């Protein structure tokens, strides 16, 4: 250990002595960015650690994450004249946005008459009336312009014969406020829409003078007196620590699917932004709502897009029955994802699953023309062959619900500003924004509609940039930062680097994932959730006995995975405790011991004569969760759902009703 510490000091002394940053890889990589961004603005600081080199940077804005939301926010800010840094642990085109398949919703009306208000209605209904209707109004009204903007950026959308953007059917989408049949609203690039969107946004970002700090792992927010003043990050390439001081910080770090054993998420989906906010003493919102995508490949968990069913694919049980006709007579296989996942689970439970163990169902595509499969679903055809050994033109795909998306996240308003709830009012956290899957506006409520996620990314990434441009002016003088700001983050990094317990990071992570998978699944019960809370408390405490093996600082993936596990753990405990506390079934949160939705009124009956339940006695409200990082103890509070649209005359709010498809 002494030798390692000495090596760290040598690196620190070398950087400190030269008083200017080495041009790491700028000459070698020949990319559009400098690894250290605008080097003239960077200064060496010795106020945090003598062992770890600490470099200070000043920007108007810093964006954490470079997926769809992060890129859209970053180049939107640069376009508006803000000196912007984008800090990302991955090269931008490696972000998980690249894995999205199905498409992006917008009421363009290319296939039939459509209206964004019908999209608004479907999204509110899909959220099981937990979505904030002002934010849903904003997103759905902005959707057509957002898609046209992407087209102007060069996104190669699939086309109809007459050259318009092709739009496919997707789950939970209807015409005429649910009374006009299935809508075709999902704009797509075959079944690789996320790939095209991410590369389009990345290509667009090259037009602007944004400083990209690639393969930098964000550790924590720099908070002072309730205001966010930037972030502190680890440069994984050389082990130096960087403090990014900025008047505006945008979190776009994605979801935390890797808290579960079977999921469609990349291994980098570790909820880093949620965890940073939690450690800053701020709440996360609605983390109990975890979406299980109906069609993950059995045994692998790889995503099979909902677009398969949008193109005409059907789900089949062991009796050869198209069973969704029983559960959703109108929408059938294109009911919302929570409905389809529960229906599949019931079929398997009741003995109508397929395979030797009758533990999954089939997705049938071979009745569709091969030309259609080749043109509209080329990626799925390849994925099914690689991961299931299935030729989709001849055989069905074995599928099973798998964790796919987190409806909850960092609470924001529709402008992207992070909020807290005190004294019956929402309060903006100065200098802090969130968007994408990390944020919770809340446009998805208790259940996200397919193809609303990519829309969420571009609309609210742009909204963050617009809000900052409206409030601030580029080049404003920054308030001073305490010399030791970020000291606790560096101390934690050092502690994890030299952790010498008896349990590997991978072992603790697996215990967490299996606990979450078995205790917070598609169907939940009070006893199982309580047992899960107890087990997660034990798993959380086991972090005190963690052991890391790599004592280096350059590309120490053991250290980074351990820091990611800390982040996952904070997300996991909030998820399962929030789920145990919510005594109802709503959207993706299905309780077998509380099967009904508990609203302020019983909306299955006439409202006349009913007495409104007090806020404390119903569950149509957002969960706000706080964690003590030292103990893992979770504290819950609640805030009301926003039931009004942005303009009642232009778009009437949708009152709660019984949700059926």
From Swiss-Prot:
GO molecular function term, any single one: succinate dehydrogenase (quinone) activity
Positions bearing Tele-8alpha-FAD histidine: 96
GO terms for biological process, alphabetical: mitochondrial electron transport, succinate to ubiquinone; tricarboxylic acid cycle
One cellular-component annotation, GO: respiratory chain complex II (succinate dehydrogenase)
The keyword Electron transport belongs to this UniProt entry's keyword annotation: yes
Biochemical pathway: Carbohydrate metabolism; tricarboxylic acid cycle; fumarate from succinate (eukaryal route): step 1/1
Presequence boundaries: 1-39
PROSITE patterns listed in its UniProt record: FRD_SDH_FAD_BINDING
Listed cofactors: FAD
Residues at the catalytic site: 337
SUPFAM superfamilies: FAD/NAD(P)-binding domain, Succinate dehydrogenase/fumarate reductase flavoprotein C-terminal domain, Succinate dehydrogenase/fumarate reductase flavoprotein, catalytic domain
InterPro entries: FAD-dep_OxRdtase_2_FAD-bd (IPR003953), FAD/NAD-bd_sf (IPR036188), FRD_SDH_FAD_BS (IPR003952), Fum_R/Succ_DH_flav-like_C_sf (IPR037099), Fum_Rdtase/Succ_DH_flav-like_C (IPR015939), SdhA/FrdA/AprA (IPR030664), Succ_DH/fumarate_Rdtase_cat_sf (IPR027477), Succ_DH_flav_su_fwd (IPR011281)
Regulation: Enol-oxaloacetate inhibits the succinate dehydrogenase activity.
Top enzyme class: oxidoreductase
Disulfide bond sites: none
Principal subcellular localisation of the protein: mitochondrion
Subunit structure as annotated in this protein's UniProt entry: Component of complex II composed of four subunits: a flavoprotein (FP), an iron-sulfur protein (IP), and a cytochrome b composed of a large and a small subunit.
PANTHER family linked: SUCCINATE DEHYDROGENASE 2 FLAVOPROTEIN SUBUNIT, SUCCINATE DEHYDROGENASE [UBIQUINONE] FLAVOPROTEIN SUBUNIT, MITOCHONDRIAL
Role played: Flavoprotein (FP) subunit of succinate dehydrogenase (SDH) that is involved in complex II of the mitochondrial electron transport chain and is responsible for transferring electrons from succinate to ubiquinone (coenzyme Q). SDH also oxidizes malate to the non-canonical enol form of oxaloacetate, enol-oxaloacetate. Enol-oxaloacetate, which is a potent inhibitor of the succinate dehydrogenase activity, is further isomerized into keto-oxaloacetate.
Annotated family: Belongs to the FAD-dependent oxidoreductase 2 family. FRD/SDH subfamily.
Protein name: Succinate dehydrogenase [ubiquinone] flavoprotein subunit, mitochondrial
Lineage of origin: Eukaryota, Metazoa, Chordata, Craniata, Vertebrata
């Amino acid at each position: 250990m002494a030798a390692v510490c000495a090596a760290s000091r040598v690196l620190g002394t070398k950087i400190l002595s030269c008083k200017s940053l080495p041009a790491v890889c700028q000459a070698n990589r020949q990319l559009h960015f400098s690894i250290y961004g605008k080097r003239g603005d960077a200064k060496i600081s010795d106020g945090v650690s003598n062992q770890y080199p600490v470099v200070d940077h000043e920007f108007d804005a810093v964006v954490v994450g470079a997926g769809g939301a992060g890129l859209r926010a970053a180049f939107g800010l640069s376009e508006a004249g803000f000196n912007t840094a984008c800090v990302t642990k991955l090269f931008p085109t490696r972000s998980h946005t690249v894995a999205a398949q199905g498409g992006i919703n917008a009421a363009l009306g290319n296939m039939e008459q459509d209206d964004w208000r019908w999209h608004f209605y479907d999204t509110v209904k899909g959220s099981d009336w937990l979505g904030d209707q002002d934010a849903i109004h904003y997103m759905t009204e902005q959707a057509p312009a957002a898609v046209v903007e992407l087209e102007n950026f060069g996104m190669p959308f699939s086309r109809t014969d007459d050259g318009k953007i092709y739009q496919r059917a997707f789950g939970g989408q209807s015409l005429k406020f649910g009374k006009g049949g299935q809508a075709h609203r999902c704009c797509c690039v075959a079944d690789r829409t996320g790939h095209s969107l991410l590369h389009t946004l990345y290509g667009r970002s090259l037009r602007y003078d944004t400083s990209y700090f690639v393969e930098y792992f964000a550790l924590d927010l720099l908070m002072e007196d309730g205001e966010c003043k930037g972030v502190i990050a680890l440069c994984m390439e050389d082990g130096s620590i960087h403090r990014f001081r900025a008047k505006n910080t945008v979190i776009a770090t994605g979801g935390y699917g890797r808290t579960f054993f079977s999921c469609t998420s990349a291994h980098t989906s570790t909820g880093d932004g949620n965890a940073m906010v939690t450690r800053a003493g701020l709440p996360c919102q609605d983390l109990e709502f975890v979406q299980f995508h109906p069609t993950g490949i059995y045994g692998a968990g790889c995503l099979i897009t909902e677009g398969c069913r949008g193109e005409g694919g059907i789900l089949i049980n062991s009796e050869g029955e198209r069973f969704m006709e029983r559960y959703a007579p109108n929408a059938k296989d294109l009911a919302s994802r929570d409905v389809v996942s529960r229906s599949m689970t019931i079929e398997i439970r009741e003995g109508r699953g397929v395979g030797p163990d009758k533990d999954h169902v089939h997705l049938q595509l071979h009745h569709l023309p091969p030309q259609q499969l080749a043109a509209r679903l080329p990626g799925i055809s390849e994925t099914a062959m690689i991961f299931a050994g299935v030729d989709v033109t001849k055989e069905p795909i074995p599928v099973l619900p798998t964790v796919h998306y987190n409806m909850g996240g960092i609470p924001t308003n529709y402008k992207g500003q992070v909020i807290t709830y005190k004294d019956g009012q929402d309060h903006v956290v100065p200098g802090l924004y969130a968007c994408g899957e990390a944020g919770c506006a809340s446009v998805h409520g208790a259940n996200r509609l397919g193809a609303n996620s990519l829309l969420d990314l571009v609309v609210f990434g742009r909204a963050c940039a617009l809000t900052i441009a409206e409030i601030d002016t580029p080049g404003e003088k920054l308030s001073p930062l305490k010399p030791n700001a970020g000291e606790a983050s560096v101390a934690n990094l050092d502690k994890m680097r030299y952790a010498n317990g008896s349990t590997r990071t991978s072992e603790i992570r697996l215990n967490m994932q299996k606990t979450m998978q078995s205790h917070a699944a598609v169907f939940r019960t009070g006893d199982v959730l309580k047992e899960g809370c107890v087990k997660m408390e034990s798993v959380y405490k086991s972090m005190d006995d963690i052991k890391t093996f790599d004592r280096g600082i350059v590309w120490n993936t053991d250290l980074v995975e351990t820091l990611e596990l800390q982040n996952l753990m904070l997300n996991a405990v909030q998820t399962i405790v929030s789920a145990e506390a919510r005594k109802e079934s709503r959207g993706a949160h299905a309780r077998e011991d509380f099967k009904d939705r508990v609203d302020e009124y019983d909306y299955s009956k006439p409202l006349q004569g009913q007495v409104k339940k007090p806020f404390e006695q119903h569950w149509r409200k957002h969960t706000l969760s706080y964690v003590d990082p030292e103990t893992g103890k979770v504290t819950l509070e609640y805030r009301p759902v926003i039931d009004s649209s942005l303009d009642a005359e232009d778009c009437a709010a949708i009152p709660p009703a019984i949700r059926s498809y």
